């Protein structure tokens, strides 16, 4: 408690000593501002123009709102001019050459931001001004401006924006206040480095490329006098890592899923479901994009083109998938395969697409049974391919029995004669053979139907294969053609904010090792 009281008393003593020990500054302040009229422009003659110089020192690029087209900046507005009423002789005031006075007590140029979007048009914080014995007045007030900025979203998110800040006197014309840049060179109205970036905190979203300043003279319809302004152009290039990771890469991944629709087998029943799911995902991306960019109808942003291109591809893939599924599930009862379809999609295209169809094999037991039944229904019950054994014709059911061995000689086939005698005497066997013939006919029809269905499935598979390659090529070429349109991808200019900012240099400079 004693130490706090000691420091407090020490500060009071120093303050009192400073106030009492600087009578020259107090006397100078009283002499300068006792009869000073801050409402009158400080010129000797009314026709004289007062030169006011201005410069911006950018401290922070707070935000660039794309949707509302507003740039928010934190900067210092450096202004200087000569006021003949605020000059003095230092020898008469104890060698005092500089004096700090409240800016509210002196004349100030009404410099405002013409393209103000929100808030105050002029500086609201009235900081102190610095007076020099020569009459030079310097005033550096800080301010946070929200300026309107025309956003060009054509190449978003690989875009480059140029936002302007137009400063000028609201009341005085060019014949009364000659507005110029502090670093302006005689004979030119352009200053290449019009904004001071020495105290700039680098932005995590934008790189500063150029900051020129241009002096303009403009005539309005209301007045004959010119009105001067200094326009500061801030050219920025977006850092694309955030949007690349969160928008571009997911959208490209979804676009490549469109290709997999044609690789998915039709029997899975999920081809259309996958396409519609992709379409819904792209719709969500489109809604997110609409929340970011301004509602302009002049251009379509690059990311919007990419999402729209992918949506069109996915919609077309749904149409193709429906056609492929229609072909896949065809049957002999609904469609007949034309000869040219069989020739093109079964014999020609598979060779061109390097497709090999697996050989379709029926059940060997069913095939052997069908052949045996067919032979029995037409001739006899033995293998008709046996060499040396002719097949006798089948007599009508109501015909009288043949004489024994009338069809062949006993020496050639005695077993055949015995079989014929037994067969003609067994009517139940005729009914069994008729039933077997019916089953054989149904089996043949089923196998033929299966063969036709497999042919249609193969045609659908052949249809899927060229569209697989077509969509793969379309996605790769289309994505590259859209994304690579952005000129910032080929812009190799180094940002000047990192080079000129002393704060960024100090932060990037490695710390020395601690002493041992």
From Swiss-Prot:
It is found in: Postsynaptic cell membrane; Cell membrane. One of its GO terms (molecular function) is transmembrane signaling receptor activity. Residues 22-243 are extracellular. Glycans are attached at residues 45, 132, 233. Residues 1-21 form the signal peptide. The chain crosses the membrane at residues 244-264, 274-294, 306-326, 466-486. One of its GO terms (cellular component) is postsynaptic membrane. InterPro entries: Neur_chan_lig-bd, Neur_chan_lig-bd_sf, Neur_channel, Neuro-gated_channel_TM_sf, Neuro_actylchol_rec, Neurotrans-gated_channel_TM, Neurotransmitter_ion_chnl_CS, Nicotinic_acetylcholine_rcpt. The keyword Transmembrane applies. It is a multi-pass membrane protein. Its main location: membrane. Residues 327-465 are cytoplasmic. It holds the Pfam family Neur_chan_memb. Keywords: Cell membrane, Disulfide bond, Glycoprotein, Ion channel, Ion transport, Ligand-gated ion channel, Membrane, Postsynaptic cell membrane, Receptor, Signal, Synapse, Transmembrane, Transmembrane helix, Transport. It comes from the Eukaryota. Disulfide bonds join 149-163, 222-223. After binding acetylcholine, the AChR responds by an extensive change in conformation that affects all subunits and leads to opening of an ion-conducting channel across the plasma membrane. Belongs to the ligand-gated ion channel (TC 1.A.9) family. Acetylcholine receptor (TC 1.A.9.1) subfamily. This is Acetylcholine receptor subunit alpha-like. The gene is ARA1.
């Amino acid at each position: 408690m004693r130490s706090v009281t000691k420091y407090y008393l020490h500060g009071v003593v120093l303050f009192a000593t400073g106030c009492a020990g600087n009578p020259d500054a107090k006397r100078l302040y009283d002499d300068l501002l006792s009869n000073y009229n801050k409402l009158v422009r400080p010129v000797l003659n009314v026709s004289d123009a007062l030169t006011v110089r201005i410069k911006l020192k950018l401290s922070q690029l707070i935000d660039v709102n794309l949707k509302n087209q507003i740039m928010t900046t934190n900067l210092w507005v450096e202004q200087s001019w000569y006021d003949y009423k605020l000059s003095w002789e230092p020898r008469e005031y104890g060698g005092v050459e500089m004096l700090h006075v409240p800016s509210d007590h002196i004349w100030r140029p009404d410099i405002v931001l013409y393209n103000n979007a929100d808030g105050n048009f002029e500086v609201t914080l009235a900081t102190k001004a610095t007076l020099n014995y020569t009459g030079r007045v310097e005033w550096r007030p800080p301010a946070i401006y929200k300026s309107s900025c025309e956003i060009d979203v054509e190449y978003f998110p690989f875009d480059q924006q140029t936002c302007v800040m137009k400063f000028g006197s609201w009341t005085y014309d060019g014949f009364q206040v000659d507005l110029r840049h502090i670093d302006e060179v005689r004979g030119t109205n352009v200053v290449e480095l019009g904004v001071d970036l020495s105290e700039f905190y680098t932005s995590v979203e934008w790189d500063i490329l150029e900051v020129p300043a241009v002096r303009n003279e403009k005539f309005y319809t209301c007045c004959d006098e010119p009105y001067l302004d200094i326009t500061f152009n801030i050219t920025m290039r977006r850092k694309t890592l955030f949007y690349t990771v969160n928008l571009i890469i997911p959208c490209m991944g979804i676009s490549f899923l469109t290709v997999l629709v044609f690789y998915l087998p039709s029997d899975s029943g999920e081809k259309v479901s996958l396409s519609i799911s992709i379409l819904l995902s792209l719709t969500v991306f489109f809604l997110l994009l609409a929340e970011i960019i301004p509602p302009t109808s002049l251009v379509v942003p690059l990311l919007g083109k990419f999402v729209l291109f992918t949506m069109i591809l996915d919609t077309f893939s749904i149409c193709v998938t429906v056609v492929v599924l229609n072909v896949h599930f065809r049957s002999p009862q609904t469609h007949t395969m034309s000869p040219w379809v069989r020739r093109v999609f079964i014999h020609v295209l598979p060779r061109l697409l390097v497709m090999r169809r697996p050989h379709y094999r029926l059940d060997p037991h069913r095939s052997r049974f069908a052949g045996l039944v067919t032979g029995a229904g037409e001739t006899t019950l033995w293998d008709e391919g046996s060499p040396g054994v002719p097949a006798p014709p089948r007599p009508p059911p109501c015909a009288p029995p043949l004489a024994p061995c009338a069809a062949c000689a006993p020496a050639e086939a005695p077993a055949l004669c015995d079989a014929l005698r037994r067969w003609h005497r067994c009517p139940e066997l005729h009914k069994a053979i008729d039933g077997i013939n019916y089953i054989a006919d149904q089996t043949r029809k089923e196998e033929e139907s299966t063969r036709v269905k497999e042919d249609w499935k193969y045609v659908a598979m052949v249809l899927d294969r060229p569209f697989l390659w077509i969509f793969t090529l379309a996605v790769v070429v289309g994505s590259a053609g859209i994304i690579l349109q952005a000129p910032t991808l080929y812009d190799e200019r180094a940002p000047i904010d990192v080079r000129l900012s002393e704060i960024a240099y100090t932060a990037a400079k490695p710390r020395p090792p601690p002493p041992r």
